[in-house]
Amino acid sequence: MNHLFVGVDAEPVRMEPYVPSFFGWQGLLAGDVKLPANPLAPVLIAPNIGSYVGGDITAGTLAAGLWDKDEMSLFIDLGTNGELVFGNRDFMMSCACSAGPAFEGGDISCGMRATDGAIEACTLDKTTMEPTVRIVGDAGQKPVGICGSGIIDIISELFRCGIINAKGLFVREGERVKRDAHGMGRFVLAGEQESDTGREISINEVDIDNFIRAKGAIFSAIATLLSSVDMTPEMIDTVYVAGGIGSGINMKNAVNIGMFPDVELEKFHYIGNSSLAGAYAITMSDQAGQKLDEIAANMTYLELSTHPGYMDAFVAACFLPHTDSSLFPHSVQEM
């Protein structure tokens, strides 16, 4: 994004050895990039770390504060690219994985962003399979679609209730489970009369498969990043989760489907749009801007696309919760 913004060739970002044309940019003015502002106004660009870890992550790391802590922290920014930072005041490792747009409602038949009408939370009755949902918006708002946090809940609940198996296929029948002419299953959350659009709101096997791939990318990236410094999930003291996928993620459900490591739920903290918080900080404080440069200089980037073992870890993570159920003892107990 930074390359396109300042008009620099972005080709090196996607080609081996995946090194950006620049990491930081000083002295840029609004007039240089044709911003509708005072042409002499300074434009601050947060520094990149690697080809797929940009200024949004350095700004998010600043906001999360792991750079100033002794404890080991994991920072996760969920989006089309899942970006991670692990470390403390002594060191920081970063990487990025291609999660796709599922966390923001993309590649999901009834998916949408976390705006009015989005189903952002869901529970299912294990016996009747009846859903109870929470919808973004005013009281009485009918559902329009499902946002990222809602998708996490729905898939976790479908798996917990034995409605889908580890591959995300429907294995239990009921009034809410429908199948098309080809036998593909879907779970109906709201019928045509119950939705705000006059269309059925449901999640099907293709949607679930897309989301399993997205969560698999996140978990395998976490596992690879930790193993690169010879550490395990048990050594994580705090997990900061950022991203605009809803008003908050049900961390228990995210762990149950194998998206995050099975650590104590008290360690998780949802911090919303950390990139925006970091950008605000460097705009308002010269000291924060200096600290941002220090963060970038002290962060090591791990390129997952060329890292041995990452693809094997990804394939293993594309099940609910994982091919190795021993990694999720609490989730297995839940089921």
Question: Can you say where each PLM-predicted feature lies in the sequence?
Answer:
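Non-transmembrane, aqueous-exposed alpha-helical and coiled segments at domain scale
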Residues: 70-73, 129-132, 222, 229-234, ...
